[in-house]
Amino acid sequence: MLRFRKVAPSLKNGGNLKLFSTSSTLKKIASSQPLRAKQVSTSESVKYPVIDHTYDAIVVGAGGAGLRATFGLAEAGFNTACITKLFPTRSHTVAAQGGINAALGNMTKDDWRWHFYDTVKGSDWLGDQDAIHYMTKEAPKAVLELEHFGVPFSRTKEGKIYQRAFGGQSLEYGKGGQAYRCAAVADRTGHSILHTLYGQSLKHNTNFFIEYFAMDLIMEGGECRGVIAMNLEDGSIHRFRAHKTILATGGYGRAYFSCTSAHTCTGDGNAMVSRAGLPLQDLEFVQFHPTGIYGAGCLITEGCRGEGGYLLNSKGERFMERYAPTAKDLASRDVVSRAMTVEIREGRGVGPEKDHCYLQLSHLPAEILKERLPGISETAAIFAGVDVTKEPIPVLPTVHYNMGGIPTRFTGEVLTIDENGKDKIVPGLYAAGEAACVSVHGGNRLGANSLLDIVVFGRACALHIKDTLEPNTPHKPLAADAGLDSLKFLDQIRTSQGPKHTSEIRLDMQKTMQRDVSVFRMEETLQEGVKNIARVDGTYKDIGIRDRGLIWNTDLVEALELRNLLTCAVQTANAALNRKESRGAHAREDYPERDDKNWIKHTLTWQHKTGDPVTLKYRAVTRTTMDENEVKPVPPFKRVY
């Protein structure tokens, strides 16, 4: 039998479990681990030291959304903890290259209402227009705030923030030509934003728990009371009690074989929500970025095309002129990815196997490449062996972003539905960033709206908590056995002796998703996909962990991450099979048209634990804005670029 024991910290620390709250900034940076737990000698056969922590608010994840929420809360006087499974500046936000959208009007006249229009159109009318209204209106303020925090934006000759062209962006509600709306730090925008936000978090009284793996939410009576996490350094278990919990854990790109995501993008927050009996939303909408390096999957930013690069087929033809006569290579990502796939299918691909396309940059002046795309020149040389001043880059559509995730309001509050199908807020639980589905991206995200999303909605979570909670509000006691199921599962999986290795099951899952739930989808392949991913999901019980230790057990962590990926993958395949239309990134060859009469609605999916069947329901898309006196809703029309 497993029982929780509170473990007393060393008396040298004065018995204070929240050591980081009194640590100097230097110690916060130097230490990745604020607590040292000692194993309790008990009669149980399995011994896990368990430590309880109490905070006003906790944030899981230290990417852009998590850090913006964290220091927003700390700045407002809340005792705040940030739990992250890796060092904050290794979070995947660091990989965002192109920029962040905001209607600053530094290059041409611009208006946030035009940005609103482009985002609704880009979402293929699956985006909630109240949330899009909020995001696009807040965008200029968010970017100027980042500038004040210290983000070193590239500059025009006049000293203004430099803005480049990006796909799907227009002026005057689509009638005024290409917009230059994407504020950039060369081609390393995410890197700069992440480091700046981390610096701001250290500046405020933030308590970091670095290299702690969040396993599950602690739920009581439908309310989120915190999370249970494992310290990867020593295997100790930590229960974090808080009035408010924010999940900012990123996407689940690693469910696919070829993706631009870091190996840490495993849908942890999504799966935690699913295991808590709550729904995930719109998982069928998986964005394929048009330009991942062929064979490596590394991202080549859309900024390349924004600076004047273009795609070529084997005939040397700029084929996007046929698919998007106006926007050409700067059409939305789903349009470009499908066009590339069609070119390859019809035999106009390049290379010995005619299975990819070329991105041409060599016509651009060398000084432009050096100043505005320095990282791309380096990436292409390392991963494709290409000198971009002389040769094209071999590229292929690659899984890049999850439009779906944890359903939330624009305040960050997590939603479910009641027995009558009406929206219901989950008390104490918030989500932001790629883990969340607000939904501002709907069926397809516009490039450079993701960095905007994380900053705006990370901040929105902090603002809503500030408005609804007083710092140092007393806590209700936590049930003595809270999190016990998580600990039982951890013990079960750590000691599992099945015949299958984590990597074997993971590869099976990735190949299945890449083959059956890809750029183009059909009933037959999706049925196969649902059947195959259910089979893979069923093999998880056969997993075997070779390392029985608790200290830096990467085998165990990968097994836990695989469970999370499977939860996301199974629901993605089921949601895709059930949506009988083509919308945004969900392209059905057997249902090639968008069906606004039946399918302007969000998919909700439930799967309580690995191996369980998936339940599907639907909820309405918000088709009104926050204030029609500010901006009118955009009614659906045929989406062309």
Swiss-Prot record:
It is an enzyme of class 1 (oxidoreductase). Substrate binds at H289, T301, H400, R445. GO terms for cellular component: mitochondrial inner membrane; mitochondrion; respiratory chain complex II (succinate dehydrogenase). It is found in: Mitochondrion inner membrane. The keyword Metal-binding does not apply. GO terms for molecular function: electron transfer activity; flavin adenine dinucleotide binding; succinate dehydrogenase (quinone) activity. Pathway: Carbohydrate metabolism; tricarboxylic acid cycle; fumarate from succinate (eukaryal route): step 1/1. GO terms for biological process: mitochondrial electron transport, succinate to ubiquinone; tricarboxylic acid cycle. Its EC number is 1.3.5.1. It is a peripheral membrane protein. Its cofactor is FAD. The active site is at R333. InterPro entries: FAD-dep_OxRdtase_2_FAD-bd (IPR003953), FAD/NAD-bd_sf (IPR036188), FRD_SDH_FAD_BS (IPR003952), Fum_R/Succ_DH_flav-like_C_sf (IPR037099), Fum_Rdtase/Succ_DH_flav-like_C (IPR015939), SdhA/FrdA/AprA (IPR030664), Succ_DH/fumarate_Rdtase_cat_sf (IPR027477), Succ_DH_flav_su_fwd (IPR011281). It catalyses: a quinone + succinate = fumarate + a quinol. Component of complex II composed of four subunits: a flavoprotein (FP), an iron-sulfur protein (IP), and a cytochrome b composed of a large and a small subunit. Flavoprotein (FP) subunit of succinate dehydrogenase (SDH) that is involved in complex II of the mitochondrial electron transport chain and is responsible for transferring electrons from succinate to ubiquinone (coenzyme Q). Belongs to the FAD-dependent oxidoreductase 2 family. FRD/SDH subfamily. This is Probable succinate dehydrogenase [ubiquinone] flavoprotein subunit, mitochondrial.
